[in-house]
Regions:
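Membrane-embedded alpha-helical segments and adjacent helix-loop junctions characteristic
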Residues: 76-182, 344-445
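Hydrophobic mid-bilayer segments of alpha-helices in multi-pass membrane transport proteins
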Residues: 14-18, 38-80, 104-113, 228-233, ...
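Short, hydrophobic transmembrane alpha-helix segments
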Residues: 25-35, 53
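Transmembrane helix-bundle signature of multi-pass membrane transporters/permeases
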Residues: 65-66, 146-152, 166, 183-194, ...
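Alpha-helical transmembrane segments and their helix-start/interface "positive-inside/aromatic belt" motifs
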Residues: 5-15, 44-62, 142, 179-187, ...
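Long, contiguous bundles of hydrophobic transmembrane helices that form the permeation core
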Residues: 2, 7, 231-318, 329-353, ...
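Interfacial loop-to-helix junctions that mark the boundaries of transmembrane helices
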Residues: 9, 31-37, 90-102, 217-225, ...
Length: 495
């Protein structure tokens, strides 16, 4: 415990030193022209650097925001009062009072509530019992794990938690190691979420983009997200062929001999949260279907579909935040009514799920809020104009930009343990670089291909590290994908 306290103290001191260093630099050499200069990159560089060093995203983003406020105030000559105005009023308050941002947060909170309700209702348990009676052999167990992961594409946390708890007894029965179960779950959850237009990832990504329809941009990135498609194809091949290689083959050989853990003690085995015994398979499938249908209806409604606009145009021009929040709230009402009608959940249990669902989404809300505020600081300092000028002056750098972003995203997410925090930092920088091109989207109706490819690279890099990392906290995510322990929520929500 004492060691943990010292670790947090050292991180706090390091952050304060960065802020102090910034202040000293300003005092020593007053900044008069920070906008559009190298100084404009200072806030995101600090955020990324601190995240890599401390492996903690919240404080890193906040220190980056604070540094941006200090530089902006110094350049404007407004002093410390200007710093707090830039950070609090122009940053936090403005972003949290933005209708689009609030709509995204509402959708995430409602999604968290629905996740809790579906877990309590027992549909996952019922599916597990059905699968245990019908699945034969190792290939069947592995493919069933994959297909269930594809079905639950609305959220990677819900995906990991549900698939892990449902399929664990079945894969244990067929002597599939926990390591392979973790691989199957992790290699399906994030990849399927980043190519699903109705998901928490789609909402989060659209919330980091300004000046263009976020959902439309997200949909355009899907064909370019080769990482997701290749990973899914690899899972299908490994599951269907029952092929293993490298360290996984060692785990699987041990599992075939009865050792599914490849260890003498099962440190991470914990009891799952209690669920009702009255749940059926339909209690899992129907709520997911209702959520998808009503969210799509909500989005095309905001795009003018019911006023005569064709489906594709309505979906492309929808107000994603309003449509998703409208659809998810409608779905929540229907799901609660359905569960109460089926008598799988009581009214009090449904109401208790509201607070529990909100609590699950707090880390995601913090990451998005800080990412929005950091983007405000970089916009104030005109970082996009500076980076855009550098990129345009170096043609080779422009061509390699997607590769650079992919590598940076992998490194950042690997070190911090947060994929959401990674694209929350990088995507605003990308959109700032292409501000001029994005300004014409409303007239042309076409999003520049380089913007789409660069954002795809950010998403692919962020999602790749969910599977690669063996450093805390993400190592726990993979173990908990197989064991579905109660403490899994923290590591997964770091994303």
């Amino acid at each position: 415990m004492e060691k943990k306290k010292k670790s947090y103290l050292s991180k706090a001191v390091f952050g304060l030193l960065i802020v102090a260093f910034t202040v000293c630099c300003i005092i020593a050499a007053p900044i008069t022209e920070a906008k559009g200069t190298l100084w404009s990159l200072f806030p995101p560089v600090i955020a990324i650097g601190l995240a890599l060093i401390t492996k903690e995203v919240y404080s890193s983003l906040f220190v980056g925001i604070l540094s941006g406020g200090i530089i902006y105030a110094a350049a404007s000559g407004t002093g410390f009062e200007g710093t707090f105005k830039a950070v609090v009023q122009d940053g936090l308050i403005t972003n949290l009072s933005n209708a689009y941002n609030v709509g995204i947060l509402v959708f995430l909170v409602v999604l968290g509530i629905i996740v809790v309700l579906m877990n309590k209702a027992g549909g996952s348990r019922a599916y597990g019992e059905w699968a245990a009676a019908h699945i034969k052999g190792r290939r069947g167990a592995a493919l069933s794990t994959f297909f269930l992961g594809v079905l639950i594409f609305v959220d990677d946390y819900f995906n990991c938690l549900t698939v892990g708890s449902v399929m664990r007894p079945i894969t244990d029965k067929h002597n599939i190691s926990r390591s392979k179960l973790a691989y199957l779950i992790d290699s399906t959850a994030a990849p399927i979420c980043i190519i699903a237009p109705i998901s928490s990832w789609a909402a989060a990504v659209s919330g980091t983009v300004e000046g263009v329809n976020g959902i439309s941009l997200f949909i355009n990135t899907i064909p370019y997200n080769l990482y997701a498609f290749l990973t899914i194809l690899m899972v299908i091949f490994i599951s269907a062929s029952d092929t293993d290689y490298g360290p996984m083959k060692i785990h699987e050989d041990n599992a075939k001999n009865g050792d599914i853990f490849t260890t003498q003690n099962n440190t991470y085995e914990q009891d799952a949260q209690p669920v009702t015994e009255r749940g059926r398979v339909i209690d899992l499938i129907l709520p997911v279907a209702v959520l998808i249908v009503l969210c799509v209806v909500g989005m095309i409604y905001t795009g003018g579909f019911f006023s005569g606009t064709d489906f594709v145009t309505a979906f492309a021009n929808c107000d994603a935040a309003y449509g998703l929040s409208l659809g998810s709230i409608s779905a929540l009402i229907v799901i609660i009514a359905y569960y109460m009608f089926r008598r799988v959940l009581k009214f009090n249990e449904c109401m208790d799920s509201i607070a529990a669902g909100f609590k699950q989404m707090v880390p995601a809300i913090l990451i998005l809020t800080f990412a929005w505020t950091l983007k405000t600081m970089t916009n104030h300092l005109e970082a996009g104009a500076f980076v855009s000028g550098v990129v345009q002056s170096a043609t080779a750098l422009s061509v390699l930009l997607p590769v650079i972003l992919f590598v940076v995203a992998i490194g950042l997410a690997f070190a911090t343990g947060t994929s959401w925090g990674t694209f929350g930092i990088l995507i605003p920088i990308v959109t700032s670089v292409f501000d001029a091109e994005l300004a014409n989207v409303s007239q042309t109706g076409e999003i520049p291909s380089m913007v789409i490819i660069c954002i795809s690279a950010c998403l692919a890099g962020a999602a790749t590290t969910v599977r690669l990392s063996r450093t805390p906290p993400l190592w726990h995510r993979q173990v908990h994908s197989a064991t579905t322990s109660i403490t899994f929520r923290h590591s997964c929500r770091m994303r």
